[in-house]
Amino acid sequence: MIRITFLAKQKVEEYSSRVTGFDILQPDISKEAIALRVNGELYDLSREIESDTEIDVIQLNDEEGLDIIRHDAAHIMAQAVKELFPNAQVTIGPTIQDGFYYDFAIDHTFTTDDLAAIEKKMKEIIKSNHRFIREVWARKQAINFFSSIGEKYKVDIISSIPESEDLTVYRQGDFVDLCRGPHSPSTSRVKAFKLMKVAGAYWRGNVKGPMLQRIYGTAWRNKDELNIYLKRLEEAKKRDHRRIAKDMDLFHIQEEAVGQVFWHEQGYTLYNVLESYIRKKLINNGYAEVKTPILVSKELWEKSGHWDKFRENMFIVDESESKKLAIKPMNCPCHVQIFNSYTRSYRNLPIRMAEFGMCHRNESSGSLHGLMRVRGFTQDDAHIFCMEEQVNSETVKFCALLKEVYSELGFNEISVKFSDRPNVRAGDNEVWDRAEKALLEAVKEAGLSYELNPGEGAFYGPKLEFILKDAIGRSWQCGTLQVDFILPERLGAFYIGADGQKYHPVMLHRAILGTFERFIGILIEHYAGKFPLWLAPTQLVILTVTNEADNYATEISNVLKEQGVRVKTDLTNEKVSYKIRLHSSNKVPILWIVGKNEVASKTVSVRNLGSEKQESSSCEKAVKLLLKKVLI
């Protein structure tokens, strides 16, 4: 007898033998169902349930349901490619945010015409309504099969799978692929998709491995969702931070310093405004700002454990045969050194240590993307050294600070991913229980919605990831808070407790922006370059109609500069219409236009970005109003 608990209905049913999802779901539900969650594991509807279990039904409206449909689409694309290009070898085809891809080994170079042909073939396969059939194979059977059809990459994948793990394949029509699953019942469940582009990719991400061709696609629940997504992509192209940065003269990146940013005056002004804003928030919230070296001995990275884990992504400097130095990829071990510089008491805790730390990571050139992925970056990094019983209160304070910062920067939709204990971890279960409880209570107290990310915490502690949504609905993971029981112990950090004994502090790794570079890229695209007045690199340009107004414009400018306004004057002999177009294209929020009449009447003509309307105002009134607006 098998007892099945339907979690959504809180109902228990008993069955005399093994059953599948199709057996236990009502026909009207099974039509909409994509898969089952069986004791936390995703199952195909056709897969047998062998023992007592708890189940949830996964439907298309669920994120997991959509992810499965995208996985289906990847397999359908692979089948289409094999039918059109029989010599192509299929390698891997996972789902990604908003879509999927599949990598192919083939001598032929895919073209846009090929993508159209593949799409057409995919529609035929979808219309054929092939069932996705799961089969468990012996290792030898799988190796023999894929070897016989010339799929050497599949054989390579099989060789890397532990022998204790079952090998599963999925069959759809005549196409068979190695896959863990799950899949929906049939190909006809894929209702709306589009192939997007072709790119190069190395096998297993190794630059020394074979070069493959990656076809990207997107799939959605219906055509309306697909069209919304495609329109969003068009809007994203218009907002591309690299294009806007060129128009606004913010920064550039060049081959002689790949992955590193050349900040121009306007861009660096924006950078400094953001840094000053964050610094003020940190001071008001009890953080002490520190500065640590960029170049640090290998010995420290070995003690911290980063040498083994991050060495491939570190820039190494050989000072001598006996001594290696590394440009720091993160700040945390250095902050522990400051903590260790003298003996701390429990009365000193918590200690909130912040740094705008310049870090470098040797990212592959193919992964670099404008400001969004760079090799040299500055983190708004901070570490809180505290006692275990302070984890909750410090997390509550951090969540409040993060919400405040995001809101003032224009992001009001925030969600949280909570990653709990992985299978391999340090520390005992009681400590993890307390840490996880402290984080969850803090998130709830902050009024933030959260999603469980089971088993994805670091080995040294659970973590929170804060995700914001931008103006066109895209999600960006920026903020983090990570509990660390291990690093303080590894690096010998301790404080003296109330009982006079030594204790290791808990270390909270936290960031709000993540990196300045990436966050500025997000801000540029969120606002499409039209920053709020307080954040804009240049807040005001005073432009003259005639040379006779030059002195007047300069006098006003000097007064405003003394008040901290980021103001410029345009005293060139160009036509005023040209000046307006120029500074409007540079996204300057406010223009003041002055000519003979304005000089005589001590007024200015005010024009706001995005408006063709000009309003006359006394200079004194305009200055007072501006000074109110430029402050956040």
Curated annotation (Swiss-Prot):
Catalytic reactions of this protein: tRNA(Thr) + L-threonine + ATP = L-threonyl-tRNA(Thr) + AMP + diphosphate + H(+)
GO biological process: threonyl-tRNA aminoacylation
Broad class of the protein's primary localization: cytoplasm
Cofactor binding comment, as recorded: Binds 1 zinc ion per subunit.
Residues that coordinate or bind Zn(2+): C332, H383, H509
Gene3D superfamilies (alphabetical): 3.10.20.30, 3.30.54.20, Anticodon-binding domain, Bira Bifunctional Protein, Domain 2, Threonyl-trna Synthetase, Chain A, domain 2
Listed EC numbers: 6.1.1.3
GO cellular component: cytoplasm
Record keywords: Aminoacyl-tRNA synthetase, ATP-binding, Cytoplasm, Ligase, Metal-binding, Nucleotide-binding, Protein biosynthesis, RNA-binding, tRNA-binding, Zinc
Entry keyword annotation includes Ribonucleoprotein: no
Domain of life: Bacteria
Cofactor(s) recorded in Swiss-Prot or TrEMBL: Zn(2+)
Region (Catalytic): 240-532
Parts forming coiled coils: none
Disulfide pattern: none
Residues of the TGS domain: 1-59
GO molecular function, one term: threonine-tRNA ligase activity
Database matches in SMART domains: tRNA_SAD
Alphabetical list of InterPro entries matching this protein: aa-tRNA-synt_IIb, aa-tRNA-synth_II, aa-tRNA-synth_II/BPL/LPL, Anticodon-bd, Anticodon-bd_dom_sf, Beta-grasp_dom_sf, TGS, TGS-like
Keyword RNA-binding in annotation: yes
Localisation per UniProt entry: Cytoplasm
Subunit structure: Homodimer.
Function: Catalyzes the attachment of threonine to tRNA(Thr) in a two-step reaction: L-threonine is first activated by ATP to form Thr-AMP and then transferred to the acceptor end of tRNA(Thr). Also edits incorrectly charged L-seryl-tRNA(Thr).
Family: Belongs to the class-II aminoacyl-tRNA synthetase family.
UniProt protein name: Threonine--tRNA ligase
Native source species: Wolbachia sp. subsp. Brugia malayi (strain TRS)
Organismal lineage: Bacteria, Pseudomonadati, Pseudomonadota, Alphaproteobacteria, Rickettsiales
